[in-house]
Amino acid sequence: MQFTKRLRDPIARGEITCSVRIWRQPHVKVGHSYRMGEGRVVVDALRQIKLEDVTPALARKSGFAGVVDLLKTAKHGHGDKVYLVEFHYEG
């Protein structure tokens, strides 16, 4: 999983533990780990959600000011399925 630079430190501190992604199909697997900086992000849960499930509270929990801000970053390619990825950081 890749994250914008401004999210990496809060993720490493455990302040951000989820991410909303818009993909055609999942790009990560539960239980797998993905390199981020000196450590790894480990995926704890992955589930498809509806676009209307992306609330201002979820956007803030994901490290964004609001839903519009999050959606500008969440879309990757031509996907139209919304996924909530929950994870933890291992340094």
Kindly give the residue locations of the regions a language model identified:
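Mixed-charge, low-complexity intrinsically disordered regions
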Residues: 1-91
